[in-house]
Curated annotation (Swiss-Prot):
Transmembrane segments: 1-21, 46-66, 74-94, 158-178, 183-203, 218-238, 243-263, 275-295
Gene it is expressed from: ZIPCO
Protein name in the entry: Putative metal ion transporter ZIPCO
Function: Putative transporter for the divalent zinc and iron cations. Required for the development of liver-stage parasites.
Keywords, ordered alphabetically: Cell membrane, Ion transport, Iron, Iron transport, Membrane, Transmembrane, Transmembrane helix, Transport, Zinc, Zinc transport
Compartments reported by the entry: Cell membrane
Length: 304
């Protein structure tokens, strides 16, 4: 019981630090000269590579094992992965479309304001502009009132957090359901070794992109508390559903594959930084792959 509690506290602290520390680092280095190696782009590349390794070495084999255990075809997993990748593409398109619409409304309002100043002497035109301004104001207020709903249900941040919350919750159930000391230590260390990459994904794709501070905090703390909550539920003797684990682990695997490449799309590659960008991504893949292989071996060998 105490060992599980210690692991839950360590992972909780790790998640808090990794989710909230990058924003402070970015604000400090914003006005400083960019370092060739130690900068946010390279750190994000390491995380992207680690996420790719997690998808192939940790999550996909886990799902395939559950499918074999329940005599289900592997195409179920690949179908869910394909659906999740397609879904994130659609939500990205919707998000970009929403951003463009907001920009168009702002530009229209600015142009109308200029037209009002230049034509103030004409009463008919002024009345027409007043009506147009009122319409724009109503439209803008409607957009503002719907922002919370849009950010919650139409951006991919919500679905990323939901999927990773359930996946992390199930990992907590796994730790909480173990009885022997050695497996608890091995599985716990494995969680600690890869949880930072998931935290960076939450920060990059949910916390950082969400303008509403309350919603951003909800996203962050939902994921931070997911694994300790899973441990608590398992300790209280609630069993997990393997079919639910198959569904959400497959979806999370698709999210990992998509986000591994999506997180690097805004990086500009130049002659000066292309080596560091390639090396950091390769380092993330190799480092996480090595960790997962070692912990999987220890878990199967029952050696600490």
């Amino acid at each position: 019981m105490w060992l599980k509690l210690i692991l839950a506290i360590v992972i909780l602290i790790e998640c808090i630090v990794v989710i909230y520390l990058p924003s402070h680092i970015e604000s400090r280095i914003m006005n400083k000269k960019k370092h060739k190696i130690f900068n946010m782009e390279n750190f994000e590349n390491v995380a992207s590579g680690a996420i790719l390794a997690l998808a192939f070495i940790h999550m996909l084999p886990e799902v395939i094992g559950l499918l074999n255990k329940n005599n289900l075809t592997i195409y179920c997993c690949f179908g869910l992965i394909l659906i999740s990748v397609t879904f994130l593409n659609i939500t990205d398109i919707l998000y970009d479309h929403h951003t463009e619409n907001c920009s168009d409304i702002d530009n229209a309002e600015k142009n109308t304001n200029k037209f009002t100043i230049n034509s103030a002497s004409d009463k008919n035109i002024r009345d027409h502009i007043d009506i147009e301004m009122e319409s724009l104001s109503i439209k803008e207020n409607t957009n503002l009132s719907n922002n919370f709903i849009f950010d919650t249900f139409k951006s991919n941040a919500f679905f990323i957090v939901l999927s990773l919350f359930i996946h992390s919750f199930v990992e907590g159930l796994l730790i909480g359901s173990l009885k022997d000391k050695n497996p608890i230590i091995i599985v716990g260390l494995s969680m600690i070794a890869h949880k930072w990459a998931e935290c960076l994904m939450i920060y990059k794709n949910a916390v950082k992109k969400t303008k509403d501070p309350i919603l951003s905090s909800i996203y962050a703390w939902s994921f931070i508390l997911s694994l300790p909550l899973g441990i608590l539920v398992a300790v209280l003797s609630f069993s997990s559903n393997e079919f639910v684990e198959i569904i959400f682990s497959s979806i999370a695997c698709g999210f990992f594959l998509y986000l591994s490449f999506n997180m690097t799309k805004d990086i500009t590659v130049t002659k000066a930084n292309k080596f560091y960008i390639s090396f950091s991504y390769f380092f993330g893949v190799c480092g996480m792959s090595t960790l997962m292989i070692v912990f999987n071996y220890l878990e199967k060998s029952n050696v600490v």
